[in-house]
């Protein structure tokens, strides 16, 4: 332990003398024992007084004994003070319990119990439990007095005497409870130290005695630590104990006269008997140690010191046993007592001097350690003071900077590793990049990855370090065993840039980075078939995405296989399972194993199409089992893959034809594109191939299941000047005028006549357009004109005068061409005129007759000669009703309607409806003009409206 570093972590000062009114002061007390607690130093003196010293060193006292106070102890849990003293010289000692919270009329604490000990032997020490259920007193003759009672209620207190082996004086007493016992009083173990032995007594087992050590300790050498561990300071070492015996020890040599536990420190006062100054430098050997007391707030309470004259110096050392350093060292001429309170240690000298040791704050201690470059001690100190991780990391950084400046790069990186998570990594990385310490840098970045604190840049740097060091083994270990502690994409990039394509492929496969896997296969290795095989192992979404991205490249290199995969993808895609061996990695050579080829070709797809349809149910069940029970077809939209066939038109045709055959695609783009491909002219095509393509195109157009866009298709056939397609689409769209126009533009007279005959039923005006065309044609079209006039005459499409005006535009048209037409029309007109005159005379006669009847009814009487009722056909009798229409009825047969003849009511009603309808039609202008436009003879329509009186 001689290599422990020494520091001055305490400030020492002499306590100034503060005198009371009676002249007493702390320095003038004849101190016999000390303790502390509840914010006071408690001192027993030789006059029997117990003195309480406050923080300003003011003293308040009360008379506790008539003679001297030997021992005192302040309880921690209650404000009770226990003391041992004498009222008579040479008499038995008296144990008293004081309640410091209550006072008598003299303002003195109340003594709640006074127990006179049965033995008139010097009391060396005593201890008690906090609940006062057990009080143990140690005597100089080797006897122990055990008091177990309710000191507040029991009238008689029994004292049990136990003798220790060899009748050795008792030098220390203490309790520590066992963990298995719930009650401290029931399960407490009494720890007894004599000058020759260390003994335990199990109070729960009839004070069963167990000797746990054959070496004891002197007065003042025993104490209990804050955690309840017994400590014995011997000349060879400091020993810790537990219930079973010795625990750890610290080899501090030298005689220890007094010990104290202060916070986490062990305070030792003593001297070195061998004058080696190992533990107590500067101590002078001399005199003989007498049995002295130690007033302590922990552990046993020792007997009063009997100071003998000596010339040796006492040396005080304060040890931090956890962090292993000496926090303070100081010499004193004499030391009679030591205790602590208010965060300070108080040293009482026999000469009346009192010294106060106050611990420096942690920051000051750390600064001191930094100046002395004791960084490891600083780290331990910061941890023991429960500094946060950030503050501790600052200490590690300081330590690392110190080692780095000294050139100890390995040691520096060890300290920097402890700052991970607190210190910015770039601070460390920059240092070792500048110094070209790649090995150290690699260690640091590895640690960043292990703690999941690495960024993509860190991964890049680490892999670059591996590649720069050509440390393939570490590179392989990193990518093989690391579980999510690095950025995968960055690792793939670095391996790819460094030419480690097999490692990059492994990472991409292991972490399902499909895009990177395919990019390496296609762009770096040109393994097109393997790439396509890999795509087929992916689920539908990934396969769809990657074929859209890399399909163009794959179609250019392996068109048949790629087209086959696309056919599957767009119909009923199911991933294949033949690529599992892809991730197998040979660590010696690190090569990707050969996988089974699973590429689908167009031939395979088309040949198996019918079989798949026939066995759809069985396949569906199998597919469900192989694909996580997916109960629906996964298929892509074929129109989204058209662009990848930009340089492979023939394979695009096959792909689209297959999609059309499936008949389950609603996109018109598929059909439009296929039609365009059929019509495209290719210089490499033979005439037979062109004819076959046009035949396919016509079959495609006429197929009722085709879902092409008609307008788009019309543009295509027009652009490619495909007559059959143009005429078919015109007909399908009922664009009859465009059909006529097409024949006119191509001077196809026969086609024009045929079109008029075919579509003239639906649109008679086609003949009129044909007549206009032939009339303006410079060629001889007399036969065609005759044909047209025949059909115009048959349908009576236009007046003869208009026909003559149209034909007059062609100078080549002779009268012979229209001779038959004019003769026929004049004959028809003459017949129609005669017919109209006959009808006019008939209407005039009927009108005159009606006027005569009206006049007769107005001017002459009407004779009713009916003898039978029209309703019941019985003879008329009174009362009866006669109408001007010559119908007669019984009044009883008419009922309530006597104003209108029932027999004529229907005809009258129809006439009224006609008149009402004509009146309504007078306001329906749109209907009139619509009828006028659709009528072959507008004049007839207007005349008819005039005849009805609608226009009146």
Curated annotation (Swiss-Prot):
Its main location: membrane. It is found in: Vacuole membrane. PROSITE patterns: CHCR, ZF_RING_2. Gene3D superfamilies: Tetratricopeptide repeat domain, Zinc/RING finger domain, C3HC4 (zinc finger). Residues 608-632 are annotated as: Disordered. A zinc finger (RING-type) spans 869-905. GO terms for biological process: endosome organization; intracellular protein transport; organelle fusion; vacuole fusion, non-autophagic; vacuole organization; vesicle docking involved in exocytosis; vesicle-mediated transport. Residues 608-629 have a biased composition (Low complexity). Belongs to the VPS11 family. This is Vacuolar protein sorting-associated protein 11 homolog. It comes from Dictyostelium discoideum. The gene is vps11.
